[in-house]
Design a protein with these regions (language model features):
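Active-site-adjacent loops and short helices of periplasmic peptidoglycan-processing enzymes
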Residues: 13-179, 183-192
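Sec-dependent N-terminal signal peptides of Gram-positive bacterial secreted proteins and lipoproteins
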Residues: 1-12
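Domain-terminus/edge residues, biased toward the C-terminal soluble/receptor-binding domains
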Residues: 158-159, 170-273
Length: 273
């Protein structure tokens, strides 16, 4: 769906039906504005980066669960508050914080990584153990980092976002909107270091002080995988995820002929982003 929306909204105008005109796509009610497709996801938004112009909006202010896209804020906040060469030592916070088969790189107690390695683990492998450890290091505690996340969201103009953890794992009190996630994703895509990490398809963490083997991380973001039906050659990277609670969520940036767009999809069916 994200591929369909980005840079293709005007093309699809002629295909729209009368049903779409009465849908929850607010941009379709703007006189003279290209009509966007009606999609199955509960909410979605496309925003032009430099002017923050809303190109497409469906329920963009509806409060929903953010899912794994939370890690975009986790990564951005870390880049803004640490050096890539800083060292991170795993404690029980990260090692014991992942339960129920959550995504991780199986980091071990007292294992040392650089911040750069941690951010690749978070963005490419969705590593919850590393996200928790980064949060403790940057914020003094996970709760302290979460407060920083919420403060930064307000600074970026978010009005309906509350973060409760740095991983995006389900929490009934954690919520956002498509519009707020677009603002957060814009700030991330505008960060050169974030883009470098997000658009990387593979990254190797060498042997550490504890682990004798390499960890080869493969980016699981479908829009960067040229063998996936969702592949989009102009994509600059992003995050996606799925849980039964949140449905499918996706945020990304794309650039074509000097135009930068931010796309957000929230609460789609499994595999539909």
């Amino acid at each position: 769906l994200a591929c369909t929306l980005i840079f293709q909204t005007p093309v699809l105008a002629a295909e729209e039906t009368a049903e779409t005109q009465t849908s929850s796509i607010s941009t379709n009610s703007i006189s003279g504005w290209p009509q966007g497709p009606d999609i199955t996801s509960t909410a979605a938004m496309i925003m032009e980066d430099s002017t923050q112009t809303t190109v497409y909006a469906k329920n963009m202010d509806q409060v929903l669960y953010p899912g794994a896209t939370v890690k975009v804020m986790t990564t951005l906040l870390t880049l803004e508050n640490a050096q890539l060469s800083d060292q991170v030592t795993m404690t029980a916070t990260g090692v014991s914080g992942v339960t129920d088969g959550g995504a991780s790189i199986s980091a071990q107690l007292d294992e040392v990584f650089t911040v750069e390695q941690c951010l690749y683990a978070i963005m490419l492998a969705s590593a919850n153990d590393v996200a928790l450890q980064i949060a403790e290091q940057i914020g003094g505690s996970v709760d302290g980092f979460v407060q920083m996340m919420n403060n930064r969201a307000v600074e970026l103009g978010c009005t309906n976002t509350v973060f409760t953890n740095p991983t995006g794992l389900p929490d009934e009190n954690q919520h956002t909107t498509a519009h707020d996630m677009a603002l957060i994703t814009k700030a991330a895509i505008d960060n050169e270091s974030f883009r470098a990490i997000a658009e990387t398809t593979s990254y190797t963490i060498p042997a550490t002080n504890v682990s004798g083997g390499e960890r080869v991380l493969t980016n699981n973001f479908s829009m960067l995988n040229n063998t996936n039906a969702s592949y989009y050659q102009y994509c600059l990277g992003g995050r996606e995820g799925y849980t039964e609670t949140t449905g499918s969520t996706l945020v990304c940036g794309a650039e074509k002929k000097g135009v930068y767009l931010i796309a957000v999809i929230v609460q789609g069916a499994s595999g539909t982003t």
